[in-house]
Amino acid sequence: VVGCATDIRVVLHDGREISGNVILSDEESDLAVLKLDTDEILPHLELRKSDTVEVGELVLAIGNPFGVGQTVTNGIISGLARTGIASGSAKGYFLQTDAPINPGNSGGALIDISGSLVGVNTSILSRSGGSNGIGFAIPADLVGQFLTQAKAGYSGFIRPWAGMRGQPITFEMA
C-alpha cells in the first residue's frame, strides 16, 4: 500500500489525519510499519496467536475498498496456511476468508469477534477484480514478527525459514 510514497497520511476513525513515515516495509510480505507524527497514545489491537485460529470462526474485514471510506464486512475463516495462491506481490502462507475484500482493503485488519487481530488483509482471487468470497490475510504471527524486527531497527524483513523443502516420495526413492 505504501510503495514508494513520500507523503504518508493516516486517517483515523474520527476523521483526523496524521502524517507519518515508513519505518520498515517489505513488498514481498505486503507489510509496512509506519511511525506517526503524534505524541498521542493511539488505540491498538492485540495480536492473536495464529495457531488458535480455526476454520469457521467469525471475522470482520476492515478497509477502504475502492476509496469509498472506512468499511467493515463480515465472514468466516475458510482455510488456514494457504500457500501459492494469493494474487499480488505478497508471498508466504495466508488465512483464507470469505469476508468481502476488494481493492483498497489491503493493509486493513481482519479481526475476530473479540476485537483481536487475526490477520492483515492482503489479496483476493477473482476473475472479475472484485470480491467473490476468496480473500487472503497475512496471519497475525507474521505481523508480530514484522513489528518486532521494525522495533529492533532492522532495515529489511528477515523471514522465518527452516532450510528444508518437502517433496512427494516416489517408488524409486523408497
Predicted segment positions?
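Serine-dependent protease modules
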Residues: V1-A174
